């Protein structure tokens, strides 16, 4: 039983650790959602000859009329972007690298409260995962008493379940805020196409591992309690079977006195024969006292 319980505890610790790593990685990265944004092409210059609009005339001459034969989507450039809880980064079309902006500032004013609530829920989710992981490790490595281990196991399961619920709420709130920002966000930011990224997948993978760890912990707690109840039932059954061989007075006598004092003064005859069934478990009364004078007279007669 001890080996099985330890294996279940190791599985719970491993799942909780995976959930903690996934959630922390998703929280600090900016790939929850990614896609493309449609922006007007910049004018061509000496440093930029591709993905730009070339009018073919001197742009600094105000007397010249500028014509462009590009129409439709040819007039636009599709740049890549990716967004997380904290920042939204897009490709810089005027140079190399990326340009990042705060996603909280991009969200509509009516949704910023929900976004902040999502951030707080994510932080609490990670903190409760840390607490649950610490309790599981404490139960696994520092608990020699089974009863103390059960208490730690129960608290770890409660904290893990609460963290999973908070994580689920946080992920759903962020998804709602992002979808509203896509429709009502700034014109220069609104995505043309978008999809969920690997950070979003890691966040929900963390939730899955968290709930699996909580279920495993609860299962370990339940199985241990059931095993203890079964052993206690067997012990009480064996105690009742032993009690049937003794009458109540003798049973209480044996329970109250030590074995040494009983063996020196009492003989117990648990007769199993059919003819001695009525005398089973009874104490033999001590022999009747013998007169000391009769003993001396008999000894004198024998000597004569």
Swiss-Prot record:
Gene Ontology cellular component terms for the protein in this record: plasma membrane; synapse
Transmembrane segments: 9-29, 113-133, 154-174, 198-218
Region listing for Disordered, in residue ranges: 266-304
All ranges on the Extracellular side of the membrane: 30-112, 175-197
Localization: Cell membrane; Synapse
Intrachain disulfide bonds: none
Topological category with respect to the lipid bilayer: Multi-pass membrane protein
Transmembrane helix among keywords: yes
Keyword field: Cell membrane, Membrane, Synapse, Transmembrane, Transmembrane helix
Keyword Lyase: no
Bias (Polar residues): 266-278
Cytoplasmic topological segments: 1-8, 134-153, 219-304
Organism superkingdom: Eukaryota
Function, as annotated: As a component of the AMPAR complex, modifies AMPA receptor (AMPAR) gating.
PANTHER family assigned: EPITHELIAL MEMBRANE PROTEIN-RELATED, GERM CELL-SPECIFIC GENE 1-LIKE PROTEIN
Similarity comment: Belongs to the GSG1 family.
Oligomer status and interactors: Component of the AMPAR complex.
Name of this chain's protein: Germ cell-specific gene 1-like protein
Organism: Danio rerio (Zebrafish)
Gene encoding the protein: gsg1l
